[in-house]
């Protein structure tokens, strides 16, 4: 598989080889959809980790599109095949490595695996995600869902002859689970190491800092799951995140007494997702549906349409929300829109830090655009915004 990837990359090796100054740089082939011409345009994207600068070349016309320019919003961790990155308001999809050096350095050991938080540990999702981020994983997909008995049987097919099979099925269907696709070098092995032994009691002895030691109870109620092999990882990820474009198991949105929260891309890329989920839970808000989305600009413009011509930061808000993955949450609470908006605090984090220092934006926000979270402003829009993500976009 890896040899095939490197071979495929060689056909797209750029004519722009390593720069004369010999500074390290990584090359990718990226595509951008030009809405005006209705065309997919292909570029070579160069990233220089020494100073965080980027350079772009038009592949078809063989000319420089963007001279080498420092760009602080792109990190080396963002650069992997299939990811969407935002470079000066253009959303680029990374489709291949641009040269064999980049393929060898960044692609040789990258793996994806399934991380599944089981029903007994969903309330500790923030802590588990925090451990995942600190262990060098990138979360590329995330979805809270419920499993039918048929889906549970497909998931546990390898345990069908085990005496505890029925207990497994009953437990995994007893409440919501959170499925994630996670990425890093040697992901399968490293995720199993972070999980600890399958029996939580043994984990507390042999791996006291592991997820199962901290959050599990026994061999079935053991907080989280990870596949053992490449084959099982591929099979299980196909169950939860079908490559055919289907939704997989049903999401958990209730569409009652709800409002919408969106954790913005900058907060995700800065590793704040787990901390924000913990803060929301500790403030006694119910999180009845959670899902990661990669939005295109048209989706964001539609979602933010009410702010167009009203908020001076509208264009920057749109650019931020489509700059990378975001996480949408259905918040449930009595009078949810008002109480959650107050918990988020003023839109400007500087004002929030002076007036409401305990709010989400005061703690996690940076600027009025990169203010960590979006929340519904008007009570009549709470359900509509939740439906936009968990009914329209999810389907």
UniProtKB/Swiss-Prot annotation:
Keywords: Cell projection, Cilium, Cytoplasm, Cytoskeleton, Flagellum, Hydrolase, Kinase, Magnesium, Metal-binding, Nucleus, Transferase. GO terms for biological process: brain development; cellular response to leukemia inhibitory factor; CTP biosynthetic process; determination of left/right symmetry; epithelial cilium movement involved in extracellular fluid movement; flagellated sperm motility; GTP biosynthetic process; intraciliary transport. Disruption phenotype: Nme7-deficient mice show situs inversus, hydrocephalus and excessive nasal exudates, phenotypes suggestive of primary ciliary dyskinesia. InterPro entries: DM10_dom, NDK-like_dom, NDK-like_dom_sf, NDPK7, NDPk7A, NDPk7B, Nucleoside_diP_kinase. Residues 22-110 form the DM10 domain. Pfam families: NDK, PH_NDK7_N. Its main location: cytoplasm. GO terms for cellular component: axonemal A tubule inner sheath; axonemal microtubule; centrosome; ciliary basal body; cytosol; extracellular region; gamma-tubulin ring complex; nucleoplasm. The keyword Magnesium applies. It is found in: Cytoplasm, Cytoskeleton, Microtubule organizing center, Centrosome; Nucleus; Cytoplasm; Cytoplasm, Cytoskeleton, Spindle. GO terms for molecular function: 3'-5' exonuclease activity; ATP binding; metal ion binding; nucleoside diphosphate kinase activity; protein kinase activity. Its EC number is 3.1.-.-, 2.7.-.-. Contains 2 putative kinase domains (111-243 and 258-391 AA), the first one is involved in autophosphorylation and the other may be inactive. Possesses an intrinsic kinase activity. Displays 3'-5' exonuclease activity with a preference for single-stranded DNA. Does not seem to have nucleoside diphosphate kinase activity. Functional component of the gamma-tubulin ring complex, implicated in the regulation of the microtubule-nucleating activity of the gamma-tubulin ring complex in centrosomes, in a kinase activity-dependent manner. Part of the dynein-decorated doublet microtubules (DMTs) in cilia axoneme, which is required for motile cilia beating. Belongs to the NDK family. Component of sperm flagellar doublet microtubules. Component of the gamma-tubulin ring complex. This is Nucleoside diphosphate kinase homolog 7. It comes from Mus musculus (Mouse).
